[in-house]
Each structure stands twice: as C-alpha cells, then as structure tokens.
Amino acid sequence: MTDMFLMPVSPETEAGAIVALNRETEENGLRLTHAQAEQLVEVRAQSLRRTGRVEFAPGRVGRIIRAFCGSPYLSREDYVDTLSALIELFDTVKTETDDRISDAVLIEEMRAAFDGACHGSLELLADEVISRVVRRANARGGAEWKMTEDT
C-alpha cells in the first residue's frame, strides 16, 4: 500500500485545493482566482528552494490562508501579495529555528503578531517580531512557548 503522506501532489491539485478555500474566505470579502492560487503554489515552491526546505505534506498554504483570512488588515487589493510574504516568512522562520516551532504554533504566533503589535505591517512582522521569535525559539531549544509583546 502506498503511503499517502509521501505521495507528491501536483501544483494543479494544490492550486485547486487553494481555490476551494474561497468558500471559507469569501465571507471576509477575500477570493483567489485559479491563476492567483497557481501563483501562491509557485511562491511556495520558490520559498522552499530558497530556504533549502522540503515539504512532505501539502496544505501549509491553506493553513496560512485559513489563519489569516479573518484579519482586519487583509484586503482584496493586497491579498495575494500579503499571502506570498507570509509564506516566505513562514519558511524563513522554520529554517532559522531548525523546525523547533510547530507549523501550527508558528502560524498562530504570526497571526497574533500581525493583528496585534504589528497592526498588519509585514515589515514589522519580519523585522522585529519574527526575529524575536527566532531568538526565543533557539534559546529555548524548541520548548513550547507563547510570544508576548516583550518577547
């Protein structure tokens, strides 16, 4: 029997899964076209190459979309660009922390900081808060933690 976890997912299939999330995001006025979903799949692939990461199970882009779609700081105009930046930032932090933070915890912390201390600023999220996340995760050796504004 083939292990489903290790079966590669085609970019077309992944883009289709992203478009299917429109059912969840439309209530917030956010919608992706198939072309935009393909763009996000390509951003993910480039980010993985840039950081030297390998992804065994698809769905990370969908988890980021689900986590951020309710943010008051997202708009239709910058939705794809913001998601692209979040995908890249996610991979950067995972690499810099040697995967000491689970995907779920990292996404939760990114969303909390984005809506909280960063007030929707990707620059603040990348430059200040995420650098603190990396330092703290590395200092604690991966112990579970929650980020605070003074972290």
Model-derived segments and spans:
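Short terminal alpha-helical segments
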Residues: 1-49
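Extended, low-complexity, Ser/Thr/Pro-rich intrinsically disordered regulatory regions enriched
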Residues: 2, 138-151
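Acidic, low-complexity, intrinsically disordered interaction modules
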Residues: 34-35, 39-144
